[in-house]
């Protein structure tokens, strides 16, 4: 193994450990606070995955939107998809986030993490999940968003109750 490859591996591991440490501190603070906030204006905060139609072999861009936002700073969202039909390519941040990190968490599973400097108060797109529709895929395939009880919080570390809406990929 070359020295360059060793440096890349060590840097990648260090970056991953820093991300996990920040996530751990955030989650510990949420669990300690025991506070929960519901969406403002009497509505519900919703994280929804868009639906897309395309043919096999095509690359698709699937939006992940956030509506009913009472003001949120931290996001930890899991996604499940059919790995037999879709190949995960990458994630692009949406207009609501300054940055986000996504890790593959096994076959057909993704985890998105973002921590902003302060509460984001707008509604819009959190991120875009980029996939390729695999050859042989047919029919409909679901992309499921999963938000646990403490997956979204505000600057004051109060958990925000979030409903999720799954998206559908239709193969033409």
Give residue spans per PLM region.
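Acidic, low-complexity intrinsically disordered segments
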Residues: 1-172
């Amino acid at each position: 193994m070359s020295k360059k490859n060793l440096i890349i591996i060590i840097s990648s591991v260090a970056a991953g450990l820093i991300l996990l440490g920040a996530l751990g501190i955030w989650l510990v603070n949420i669990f300690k606070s025991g506070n929960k906030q519901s969406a403002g204006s009497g509505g519900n905060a919703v994280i929804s995955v868009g639906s897309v139609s395309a043919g096999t072999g095509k690359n698709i861009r699937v939006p992940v939107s956030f509506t009913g936002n009472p003001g949120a700073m931290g996001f930890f969202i899991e996604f499940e998809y059919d790995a037999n039909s879709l190949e995960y390519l990458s994630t692009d941040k949406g207009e609501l986030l300054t940055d986000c990190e996504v890790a593959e968490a096994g076959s057909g599973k993704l985890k998105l993490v973002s921590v902003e400097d302060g509460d984001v108060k707008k509604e819009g797109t959190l991120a875009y999940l980029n996939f390729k529709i695999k050859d042989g895929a047919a029919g409909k395939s679901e992309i499921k968003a999963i938000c646990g009880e403490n997956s979204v919080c505000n600057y004051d570390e109060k958990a925000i109750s979030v409903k999720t809406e799954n998206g559908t990929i239709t193969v033409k």
